[in-house]
């Protein structure tokens, strides 16, 4: 399903591959590599949406020779330059309260922004958490989007107006972004290096997970993994 300005559109059917994961310490999860999905289509199980207005997002499966798991990736390819426009691809087949979400991403282009993000506890296009790595700004920031307003949340132990952390995010190179969310505590990692924690209690219930970009960011994603915390 595609949701744009309140209108739902059913994408072309596609065949995807979902690997089921199981581990006693973390619970059950899924890993999605898009390699059996139809090129040019939105993969099955994914819902396209957008926060704020602007040109419609364009999420589609592409072939990429550099993909961590070849041959396919999921890409947001629209280059609409509306600054406050946040394209979303939501994994529509699972909802969880506590767990970990991980994705590999490559910042391909964008003059306004080159932000690649993970979404969790998603309720609707105007209410969710998101952490994004920005290859133009060279930082990683965690936000809440509440009633359509995006607010940055300072790292634990930092002053209240601290804007994430400065960190090199390479362009045209694959990186791995991860967030663990357990109760009110969120832990952000980039390339297997812990960057910071955030505490917040705005959204405490279960919600969906997914992917996020901003404005004209063209971002490739691969190996999306979501693991639910055991016992939740």
Regions found by a protein language model. Give the residues of each.
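Extracellular carbohydrate-recognition regions
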Residues: 26-52, 232
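Ligand-recognition surfaces built from glycine- and aromatic
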Residues: 31-33, 203-232
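Secretory/extracellular carbohydrate-interaction modules
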Residues: 39, 76-150
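Extracellular glycan-recognition surfaces and repeat-rich motifs
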Residues: 41-75, 82-85
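Beta-strand-rich interaction surfaces with strong enrichment in secreted/lumenal proteins
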Residues: 87-94, 163-169, 210
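Short, aromatic/His-centered strand-loop micro-motif at the edge of beta-sheets
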Residues: 148-176
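Localized edge beta-strand/strand-to-loop motifs within extracellular or lumenal beta-rich domains
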Residues: 173-187
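Short, solvent-exposed beta-strand-to-loop segments that form ligand-recognition rims
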Residues: 184, 189-208
């Amino acid at each position: 399903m595609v949701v744009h300005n309140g209108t739902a559109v059913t994408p072309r059917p596609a065949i995807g591959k979902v690997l089921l994961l199981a581990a006693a310490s973390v619970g059950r999860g899924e890993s999605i590599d898009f390699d059996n999905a139809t090129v040019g289509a939105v993969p099955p199980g994914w819902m396209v949406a957008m926060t704020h207005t602007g040109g419609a997002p364009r999420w589609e499966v592409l072939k990429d020779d550099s993909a961590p798991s070849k041959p396919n990736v999921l890409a947001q390819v629209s280059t609409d330059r509306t600054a406050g426009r946040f394209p979303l691809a939501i994994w529509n087949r699972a909802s969880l309260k506590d767990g970990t979400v991980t994705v590999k991403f490559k910042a391909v282009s964008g003059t306004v922004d080159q932000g690649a993000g993970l979404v969790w506890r998603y309720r609707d296009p105007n209410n969710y958490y998101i952490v994004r790595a920005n290859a133009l700004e060279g930082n990683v920031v965690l936000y809440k989007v509440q009633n359509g307003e995006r607010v940055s949340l300072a790292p634990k132990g930092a002053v209240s107006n601290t804007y994430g952390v400065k960190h090199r995010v390479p362009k045209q190179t694959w990186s791995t972004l991860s967030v663990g969310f357990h109760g009110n505590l969120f832990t952000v990692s980039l390339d297997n290096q812990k960057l910071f924690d955030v505490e917040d209690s705005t959204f405490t219930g279960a919600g969906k997970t997914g992917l996020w970009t901003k404005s004209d960011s063209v971002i490739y994603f691969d190996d999306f993994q979501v693991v639910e915390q055991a016992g939740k």
